Amino acid sequence: MQVEVCIQSQINQSSKDKLTNLNLYPAGIYPQTWKNWFKTWLEYLQPHIPPAPSYELGVLLTSDEEIQFLNANYRFQNKPTDVLAFATLEVKYPKSEDMLNSMPLSIGDIIISVETAQRQAQKQEHLLLTELAWLATHGLLHLLGWDHHDEYTLQIMFHQQVALLNKVGITIDFDPL
């Protein structure tokens, strides 16, 4: 399975000043690491996703200010959030067999606020790397159609996130309530 991941960082200077040791790769997570994580996660989830020879997705690491703008415009909630996911698998468009076999299947974009991730990591007493991976798994599951309409489905999703993190060697203390 091939996986293409486009990582972008869009953090303004005032936000950079709020974050400690922030560079283009927060928590030292380089593009190849993101790609390896998503490849591992998609392989693990493959029985539950549309078959394709390759997949592609985007990850935008941004500020509270930018994610609040997106949250207000797309979810009508004028406040920052930790992660947003914009799925392309929900979009219906004609696909020929040749197209499916020759082009990567775009599953969507994940937007993560590094500022919120840093606060949540401190609150949960784990590394920023762990929090960013946690949020990435949450966004990925949303891209693949998972949702949490109530506490029960949220807990199922959280347990799946723990399993995904374990697949890439990240452990997290998870307290379901």
Q: Can you annotate each of these PLM segments?
A:
Residues 141:
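Conserved ATP-binding N-box helix of the HATPase_c
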